[in-house]
Design a protein with these regions (language model features):
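Amide-donor transfer/coupling interface in amidating biosynthetic enzymes
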Residues: 1-118
Length: 118
């Protein structure tokens, strides 16, 4: 789910949009203190979160496959120009996931191309 679209990478999204993103990692998760995660949230730096089908972040393995704090899937730098995320948004193509419903294309690369004038 898009938690904040303050980053140019997420300019093509709306807060609350839900995307299905491939997850392919055996290790790693977002960890930080409660104080820091609250500060990140207050500053709009939590970009994306793992959510259930109703858009609610959770800690259940079916929702949050790696146990990330606050179900954080992605964060940004203070200016939003750097986006770090766990899911593989680059692993999409038309018809690739025929048996999995959902929206896949967050337009990350299109938005970045437009912002950075590439």
């Amino acid at each position: 789910r898009i938690a904040s679209n303050r980053s140019p990478w997420l300019a093509g999204t709306q807060v609350g949009d839900i995307y299905t993103v491939p997850v392919s990692h055996g290790e790693g998760r977002f960890l930080c203190s409660d104080e820091l995660v609250r500060k990140l949230a207050a500053n709009g730096r939590i970009a994306t979160q793992y959510v259930d089908e109703n858009g609610v972040p959770g800690m259940d393995i079916d929702v949050n496959p790696n146990g990330s704090v606050w179900a954080v899937e992605g964060i940004t730098s203070p200016d939003g120009r750097i986006l770090g995320k766990m899911g593989h948004s680059e692993r999409i193509a038309d018809g690739l996931y025929k048996n999995v419903d959902g929206r896949y294309d967050m337009k990350l690369f299109q938005s970045a191309k437009e912002y950075f004038n590439i």
